Amino acid sequence: MKKLPYIAIRNQLIAPYSTATVKIGRPNSLAAIQFAQTGFNGEIYIFYTKDNKMVDSIKKTSDLEEYGVKAKIKEIVEQGKLQNVVFEVEELVKVKEIYKELGKYSFTSDIFASVTEVEYSGNFDILSDYRSKAKMLIEKLSNLHDEIGSYIYGGRRGIKELEKAFSANTNISPLTHDSFNVDIWKIIDALTIEHSWKEYFAIINETNLEKNYELAINMLINAIKMGKLDEEVNSTMRGDLENQQRDFLLRERLRQIKKLLKDDEAGAKAIENMEDAEENARQYPDYVIEALKTEQNRLASMMPASPEANISKTYIDLITTLPWKKVSGELLDIDNVRKILDKHHYGLEKPKERILEFISVLTYTKKENEKNEYVPVKGEENRFIDKNLFVNKTGNFLKDRVNNIPILTLIGPPGTGKTTLAKSIAEALGRQFVKISLGGVKDESEIRGHRRTYVGALPGKIISGIKKAGVSNPVILLDEIDKMSSDFRGDPLSALLEVLDPEQNTNFQDHYLDLEYDLSKVLFIATANSFDSIPAPLYDRVEFLELSTYTLIEKTRIARTHLLSKILSLNALTEKQYQITDEVLAYIIKNYTRESGVRNLQRLLDSIARKIVVRILDKKVDKEFVIDKAIVREFLGPELYNEKGDETQPKAGVVNALAYTAYGGTSMTIEVTTFPTTAKGALNLTGQLKDVMRESATISLAYVRSNAEKFGIKDFDFENTSIHIHVPEGAIQKDGPSAGVTFTTAIISALSKKAVPNTIAMTGEITLRGKVLPIGGLKEKSLAASQIGIKTIFIPKDNEKNLIDVPEEVKKDIKFVPVEYYDEIFKYIFEAKNK
């Protein structure tokens, strides 16, 4: 046979001796169509891609199916950049080879082909009998259409045309098989709507016409059976379908419909699995199975494509995927816990000690209460069914013991290891870890879920977290619990109180799930930055564990043992290419960071690593690189902070104060100046001071005025002088009473024109009688003072007991002076200086 252009198609079946429309858009196919029209009288081959491959992936002959068809272009309809091409399809052909060139025509890809003729075999008498049988079946199928109007395969028009073709073609020559071949393909073309690729290619690849005719006749018989079956279904199944073949066909039809609708009967299978499980190892509580049956019955009555059906399927999926009684095994080994905590965290001795106590109680109560019957889950390693979960008695969940182990809340500045500490607890126990971020959560539904009546409803964060964990005893971290707030949508904290109360969380009810869930096996750990923003009701339900600011030695040790190994790994550096001493690490910490944790320190060390990598690629570094202070200044720029503090001459009215914030300890300066004014006793406050701090400044001024003679400023004209108090860094809001003694000292210094040494700082609340009241965060304030070179700190007498928490390295460099009344500070600074 002659060589012609060809196009390759996928996802479309084209029968020989039929009319077919193909949408053309790819450059190769458009070129083939053009060549066929201009040089080959509209003749073209149509081939199928093998295994339904993309047309663009055709590179060789073996990428095509063995058989295709010859066709002639009948009509082309332009549709934008696409062409709808109508083909008059002729005989079946066998692909031989594909080319890029054909005579004077050529293209960048293979768009020309050569083929061989397909030779058929078959007994003329048998084929004649088959044809007579097919003609009779076609007439029967046509009559069935006339009687019931049933939609069968090709429809009324296709069957009528088929009947007409068989009636007209009466004279068949015994010398050729062409007429039988045409008849077979007309049947297939008429019934092409529902028959599969497998059947189609089975006929294409078979050259024995007798076998092909058998397949075609079977298709006709099935079409008649399906037509009669449709009649019975449409008449509400008036008769019982006792015939086994009818029953099979009906089920097959239902299966195909569900397959098209993608309805996989997941809910029904889930119920089957639940009920087939052994009684002593059943994962699902009885009331869950009943709820699932009810929901499955509702789903069965819905239209499969309706929105309600999709909502119901999602709900069923949630119920079947929640772990319910499934738990993971625990590694209750104190030595292992201690090893893991020390591996991931340096220092933090008090938090580690409390966590060991916490896990010790879990271990001991577990041994004392071995009544818990754990049944292994088949096919899942380290997964068990806890029979004591969801025990339903008289409508309430009761357990043999109450889980009275308190819920830990880790309090500390950012970067001090709260989240990693929670992960270490999960690792030590061998439990799954789930983190739930609560920062900015304002809606109660985020915790308790949305009711399913709302569009886009979802379960709350707690149930979603348990689903993600896949077990009912994970470690759940409630991160930034102090950052939640409430608005008109409800109070998420109130919903969280139920979760965190061991007396109530055995029957926690999510609005979306609408079924009680036992949270008693969940180990909740919360984190927060400060106590101030934690609501009062939460204090009764959790135990606070404070993670304080790291010292210089601790930061250096953490950098050496944890940060550097991670940074070297991330940047593919060796220890010789990143040589840094503890002295240089301390230099970076003192002069480039002001933080409680080590996050910024890690960023700086990582920045140095990246610059070393650049030098290696520029061939400026070979096998070794030593980082000294000069290299640090070159890589990180000038020093950001002065570790020796303010070395300028002390000035009257300027005093160092110490503060404790959610981000750790910090130092600040109080400035006071005076100037004449017509306003009597005016006091100006600037620097974004909030109410408590403004009141503290007012109290300090009142105390100074009432004791002016004692402080040596009795001749000062308060009535005609304005006193201005400023706290630098005015963009940052400041509050708290602990700057009272600092305000007092700064006012006395400004009015008496006597400067206070830069190496002195103080903290403490003051009363109108001059009593110095205790403050919080002494350790953090002391660490902040040590970073700026402070040598003496005045603290309240009542805080003397807290000096035990201050690291020895800080106490070695700083003198702490406990005072009960302000007079003691005045005498130390002003009178001692005069002497």
Curated annotation (Swiss-Prot):
Q: Please tell me whether the keyword Transmembrane helix is annotated for this protein.
A: no
Q: Where is the active site?
A: 738, 781
Which branch of life, at top level?
A: Bacteria
Task: List each copy of the Lon N-terminal domain by range.
Answer: 4-224
Q: Name one GO cellular component term.
A: cytoplasm
**What UniProt keywords are attached to this protein's entry?**
ATP-binding, Cytoplasm, Hydrolase, Nucleotide-binding, Protease, Serine protease, Stress response
Give the binding site residues for ATP.
412-419
| NCBIfam families assigned | lon
Task: Cite the HAMAP family for this sequence.
Answer: lon_bact
Question: What is this protein's function?
Answer: ATP-dependent serine protease that mediates the selective degradation of mutant and abnormal proteins as well as certain short-lived regulatory proteins. Required for cellular homeostasis and for survival from DNA damage and developmental changes induced by stress. Degrades polypeptides processively to yield small peptide fragments that are 5 to 10 amino acids long. Binds to DNA in a double-stranded, site-specific manner.
Q: How does it assemble?
A: Homohexamer. Organized in a ring with a central cavity.
- Sorted alphabetically, which PANTHER family does this protein's record hold? ATP DEPENDENT LON PROTEASE FAMILY MEMBER
Protein name as it appears in the record: Lon protease
Q: Which organism is it from?
A: Metamycoplasma arthritidis (strain 158L3-1) (Mycoplasma arthritidis)
